[in-house]
């Protein structure tokens, strides 16, 4: 495999500008936007994000990542509704009695490129907070501290710590994560 030096960054990471400008999306979303723009198609759309399955016997999760999705969509001409961060949601595709975690309404071409990063922001954070909440339940009243950032990419450390904090952890080990959580 050929070695490639990065010219504009130190690490193989998307920066905030890359994410906000939709450079982290899949190419078919870019192609879709180009077709919609070229043909001046202004179709109104509603995107609903559900959790239909969780890899645990219990069908609940803890929603996180909403703050980041709100920041991603900030300034776009769309209407957004979301459950509050930290809420416990049910992920049971066998029943009609569950609601979307996130709803976006607007012209599809205004938010099509953000679908991929939105789902990534939600699923990465929510998977950590859901797992962390299960540790919180298992620990009961015992003190629970997060030391998980030594096993994730350093860029994700604040996300992991925030997700653990929202899930009920008593303390955080990562310096930057703890500082950002407050």
Task: Annotate each predicted stretch with a short phrase.
Residues 1-180:
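Ordered alpha/beta subdomains of enzyme catalytic regions
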